[in-house]
Amino acid sequence: MTQFASPVLHSLLDTDAYKLHMQQAVFHHYYDVQVAAEFRCRGDDLLGIYADAIREQVDAMQHLRLQEDEFQWLSGLPFFKPDYLNWLREFRYNPAQVCVTNDNGKLNIRLTGPWREVIMWEVPLLAVISELVHHYRSPNAGVDQALDALESKLVDFTALTANLDMSRFHLMDFGTRRRFSREVQQAIVKRLQQESWFVGTSNYDLARRLALTPMGTQAHEWFQAHQQISPDLATSQRAALAAWLNEYPDQLGIALTDCITMDAFLRDFGIEFASRYQGLRHDSGDPVAWGEKAIAHYEKLGIDPLTKTLVFSDNLDLQKAVELYRHFASRVQLSFGIGTRLTCDIPQVKPLNIVIKLVECNGKPVAKLSDSPGKTICHDKAFVRALRKAFDLPQVRKAS
């Protein structure tokens, strides 16, 4: 299936903020590290028929480059260094790093190359896949239907929060990867800008064009890669946390907790890290149980939870966000990142549950052992066993 009308992507910045944040850290600290990443569809969708169309879009991405106005805008942000931005100015996507195949209806994608380059593929490639699939499956759906659905949800949201103090409710758009389309995401974000509790977007292109705050720190791959970068597997998570502070000592201080489960994370998150990091991000498992563990951990360390921020971003919608806000608002600072339930929430449209995750670093396996068993990713069962042993986790979950 080919012949999509035009390139889906129009800007190098049409990606999530944490990709550039991580890329700068990789550029400075791990310039020569090599990685491999793979696509997964967690649902039962047979997406292989779109392989040719996806390959066309991958080829088109080599023409994207950082424009001068984009360069100047990034230069005005407090956390980017001139050497990285000058390098990014010359960056081009290399389609040779991407292998796209149709395996009897199953879509297979494997990315290989220097981490500093491969790191850029995940978010825009997922956005491309999502937009292509929805273009063919739902050709008559689009911005109008998405905005109608959002308005209906906002009416319910207003009723739900009528008697709540919403002054500490902060919502972010995290919807780039699985959006219905670029146009839908932009329309949704522009509508949400009218709400006092909407504080920003993870999409750098939208943040620049709509004068919003870009949101994001690091992703699972930062911790996964350190499983092979660090000489000692048992201390790899601490090495990742320390390396992040080395690059960003006073900003971008929200740590992701579920690469090797929340319990293993908290064992590594001692007083020095807990004091210096601004807060934590939830991305799998029971959010209430996770939040209670986080608050208890801060209290045990003698840190006032009200000086820290918990970011919830796992499969949220507005109603779930309000429920979590009711539960935690008086005890800790809160932010909520909603993705698919904002940017691909259209009647009769089935969002894709798709990811691209790191599977190798320097030719050796890495793994994600999240707080949701179905999100565990690794080819090498022996490495999963070694990782569980190193972090004192029970040998129960299977890698997928």
UniProtKB/Swiss-Prot annotation:
Keywords: Ligase, Phosphoprotein, Pyridine nucleotide biosynthesis. The keyword Metal-binding does not apply. Gene3D superfamilies: nicotinate phosphoribosyltransferase. Pathway: Cofactor biosynthesis; NAD(+) biosynthesis; nicotinate D-ribonucleotide from nicotinate: step 1/1. InterPro entries: N/Namide_PRibTrfase, NAPRTase_N, Nic_PRibTrfase, Nic_PRibTrfase-Fam, Nicotinate_pribotase-like_C. Transiently phosphorylated on a His residue during the reaction cycle. Phosphorylation strongly increases the affinity for substrates and increases the rate of nicotinate D-ribonucleotide production. Dephosphorylation regenerates the low-affinity form of the enzyme, leading to product release. NCBIfam families: NAPRTase, PRK05321.1. This is Nicotinate phosphoribosyltransferase. It comes from Salmonella paratyphi B (strain ATCC BAA-1250 / SPB7).
